[in-house]
Amino acid sequence: MARKVVQHRIVDLTLLLIVVAIATTLRSALWPTESEAVANVITPIGGVLQSWQQHIPVLSAILWAFTMCFVGLGVGRLGVRYSIYPAYTIMGIPIFAVVAACIVGSTEYMVLAVLALVMYLATKSMTRFIMRTERFGDLSLAMLYLGVLPLILAPAALLYVALPLLVLFVRASWRDLAVAVASLLLPLFAICYWNWCAGGCFMAPADTIYSNLLTVSEYRFFESLNFVTIILIGIVIVMIACAVALTVSDRYSIKSKSRVVLRFNALLMCVLMGLFALPSATSALFVLIAFPVAVVVPLFFVRMGVGFTETLYRLMLLAAAVNVVLMAF
C-alpha cells in the first residue's frame, strides 16, 4: 500500500515564503540584535558589496527580500524538476525560509543576496550534473559558483579544501576531480591575475583570503541563541537526522542518482555547519546552510509518517514565528 504524503499547495508555501521574507527583513532592519549587526570580515567582493549597501541601505534590504523569495522558490522546485524524491514535494521552500532567515539573521543584506544567488546557481548546476547530464560543463559551472563564495564570505575559504574531497567521495573519478579543482580555483586565479596586472603581487589576494579566514569577528554563535532559537534548531536537526537516516537505509525507493545528490548535500551541510567553528564566522553562514538543508530535508516529509512530519513542521513554524517576535524585543 502506498504511503500517504501530505501535498502542500504551491500557493500556500509561496505566500509563506513571502511573509517570512518581508517579516524577517523588516525585523532585522528595524530591531537588529547584536549578533546580527556584526559585520562580515572584508573580502575582495564582500567589501565592495558592503560599500554599496552603505549608499543604498533601503534598496539593499528590498533586494535581499526579493532574492530570498526567488531562490527559495527555485531550490524548492529542484526536487520536482529533477525527480530527487520518491514522491512530489516542494517542502524545500519553507525549510529554506526558516533556516535562512528565522534562526539568526544579518543586516548585511547585499552580501546575503549575492551569497544566496550564487549558492542557488551552484546547487542547481550540481543537481543537474548528477541527475541529468553528467557533463563536465555542469560540474565546472557548479564548482565555479562555489569558488566565488570565499571571495564574498571569509569563512567559506575552507571550501577550497573540502569541496574536492566531497566531489571525490560522491564521484570517484580523477577526471571529475580535476575539473572540479580547476573550476573551483578559477575565480581566485582571476582575482590574483587582475591584481598582478594592476601592479601588485600575484599571490596577494590569496594571502588576504587566508588571513581573512583567521581574522576574529565579533560574532559569538552561542551568545546569539535564545531558548526558542535552540528549540527551532533542535527541530531542524531532528528533520535532518531523519532524512539522512532514510538516505542511508532506504535503498529501494530512492534512485541511485538521487542518493548521490542527497549524500553530497548532506556532506556539504556538515562542512558548512563546521564553518561556525572558525574565528571569522558570522550569522551570514545560515544562508549558505539553508540550501543543502532544503535539498535533504524534503525526503523526511515523503518517507516518514504524516502525523509525525506534520507535527514537527507546525512546531517548526510556531518556533520560527515566536523567535522572530522575541528577537524584536
Residue spans of the language-model regions?
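Juxtamembrane membrane-water interface segments that cap and precede transmembrane helices
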Residues: 39-55, 206-230, 242-246
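Transmembrane alpha-helices of multi-pass, membrane-embedded glycan-processing enzymes
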Residues: 63-74, 115-118
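Transmembrane-helix signature of polytopic, membrane-embedded enzymes
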Residues: 75, 79-99, 117
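Aromatic- and kink-enriched transmembrane "portal" helix at the membrane-lumen/periplasm boundary
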Residues: 93-113, 125
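Membrane-interface transmembrane helices that cradle and orient dolichyl/undecaprenyl
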Residues: 121-137
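Membrane-interface alpha helices of multi-pass inner-membrane proteins
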Residues: 138-152
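Perimembrane helix-loop-helix junctions
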Residues: 159-185
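Membrane-water interface signatures at transmembrane helix termini and the short loops
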Residues: 245-305
